[in-house]
């Protein structure tokens, strides 16, 4: 019985998501920017926000106290409904961000295509577990919406980190910028800045809390970088991937 409920909700969520996605003019514009080679990771975050918004709308319409048995999101239902649609968001967003990275690499004469990160299955399981603990699903709706958005935006963060690691290992000098959103919390403001990437750096700058809209960019800058531990600004010139 509950399996039938899961499949009915999943099919309805997927149908509504596909409808929203296919008719979106904003998505069409963002995909066009990939085709024309104009896309940046700012577009990756815009794309992620649209995708998360579509999924949240589909979930809100089809996963309710009326469609769930006893008004509760049991774990196996969460696993059968939320896990596949979250994984779909990850695929859509990381593929978009990968294509953006390919464009950026080409502009910097880097002969490597962008890469996609592995899905973080533990985070998906964590979301399923968190929202299946509530006795009344409707009381958790806002939190679930925030988690869907956070997870989808983090797919961009993870893609950028994956590519920064890859290029750094090849000897390219990667610089990471984190921009705090207007009105950001104290924690996010403390992370705002430009950082010289290294394999041993603190990767907290790639993390985000619920409802965080901060963005992360990667580039190959000259003349300035910020040490991730001391946050002091150094002036200099890059030569062979090192500051002189």
Regions of interest found by a model, annotated:
Residues 1-209, 217-244:
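Domain-core detector
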